[in-house]
């Protein structure tokens, strides 16, 4: 009971703790900082150190966001940030951005955390929907990729498609032969 203005969906259903900030909000921050100005002021929030420095629910992009920008955001490993997975000790000499689970672990009584980037080797598939208002509604495109977003190519599938493209058909190829 109380005024609607006092209700916080996030606080009621998904209270923020270190894990939620570092594994979920950090990925939102990575997107936001790519398209909007002044997002570095929320780095401590994204890293799970300052839950009170809450990010906005949405941002105004500094310019029109292209499909390629969204593709690049989906392929992100926090490059160029304090959480850059290609530059920490886990990256080794090859700057490998992949970490094996669990995300949190302990060595000699000290707790550590691996990042949970947007692009990850556990991805089954990913997609980006592109609406193009100057075309008829059925000419929208679903850009579809299989496996890790950082290393997979994208196949355009038009919204007007009536069948699964041959290259993605279950009848095309065999995993056992």
Which sequence ranges carry the predicted segments?
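C-terminus-biased signal that marks the final domain/tail of proteins
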Residues: 1-177
